[in-house]
Amino acid sequence: MPCDCSDTAVFAGLARQLPRDAVWVTSDLRRTHETARAIVHAGLPGPDPIPGPDALAIPGLAEQSFGEWQGLTYDELRHSRGGAFHRFWHAPAHERAPGGESFLDLMERVTRAIHQVFDANRGRDIIAIAHGGTIRAALGLALGLEPEACLAFTMENCSVTRLDHVEGPGMGHGWRVVTVNRPPR
């Protein structure tokens, strides 16, 4: 699914907020690459090409897979099922769409990807261009939340969520949530 990158003020706002000299990662989905390119085009020094050796596409950061439902609107899905609800809608944290993932599956995948990226880049700022579900899962890791609690977060497109990894004397060991869903302007 392509990304609408026409609102240049949004990307200029992101370019002002995000750290310089950071490691860049995206998911393997095209819209994250387009978003990253738009941020660089708006003035944040960044890698070229995206994805490329300096902007890694990490499949583990992809959005939750909805399997056979991928790309369908809610109305299309409801119509295709004759108005009947699939059990996924009653317990989306643990149930899977046909051929897809549960939110718990997503959390496990995203947690592995975050540890992989963090371990390879310890001490560096990381800009991760990701998806709403991926960000909810990252917040779950940072806050030690159950999957159901993560689904309570709303993530707007192009918002900034900042997580800092902390460790050391008097700091503990883990994650600090600095901001969630901050508008880019």
Language-model regions, residue ranges each:
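Active-site-proximal alpha-helix that buttresses catalytic centers in soluble enzyme cores
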Residues: 1-48
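GST superfamily/GST-like fold recognition
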Residues: 132-136, 162
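Alpha-helix N-cap/helix-start capping motif
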Residues: 29-33, 82, 132-133, 157
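Phosphate-handling substructures
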Residues: 2, 41-112
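GST-like fold's C-terminal all-alpha helical module
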Residues: 106-132
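Acidic, low-complexity terminal tails and accessory targeting/binding regions
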Residues: 64-76, 119-124, 140-185
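Short glycine-rich phosphate-binding loop at a beta-alpha junction
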Residues: 21-28, 54-57, 125-129
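Active-site signature of alpha/beta-hydrolase-fold catalytic machinery across serine-
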Residues: 38, 137-141
